[in-house]
Amino acid sequence: MTGTPAMTDAIDRARILQLVPHQGDMCLWDAVDAWDGDSIRLRTATHRDPAHPLRSGDRLRALHLCEYGAQAMAVHGGLRAAASGGAAAPGMLVALRGVELHVERIDTLTGDLECEARVLVEGEGSQQYGFRITHAGTLLAEGRAAVMLRPAP
């Protein structure tokens, strides 16, 4: 992790809920393990929840890892804004590129999911991140996601 000094104090779900618009069961991340101005590392066990809001037909498909990647971006944006004394600008996911899924489903995985997301490009009204999601060291999904930002409230 590069950029601003690394923040290594673990951040729990309660703090994540203060930073993002995703609330209740739709908040997919449980903890931030490390972050800096350019990147973030997170982990979660939410994929094992039988009541997961994205489940369909009693399965949680790997396609939903794109939402995990997008929410990693939101958590990172919230942390960056809070570190600057402000609030994150609301964003809307507008594109996914180069997404590769290496499994079909994730609800059967027993350990935590881990994600690393990194800012690739950003401007005043948009951001693009790369994300990689792993389980026990095995790559599950990777890709890029772009968001358009609205002015912060």
Labelled PLM ranges:
Residues 23-61:
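Catalytic strand-loop segment that frames the active site of acyl-thioester-processing enzymes
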Residues 27-30, 94, 115-117, 143:
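Small-residue-enriched segments and motifs
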Residues 75-116:
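Hydrophobic beta-strand-centered segment that forms part of the acyl-chain substrate-binding groove
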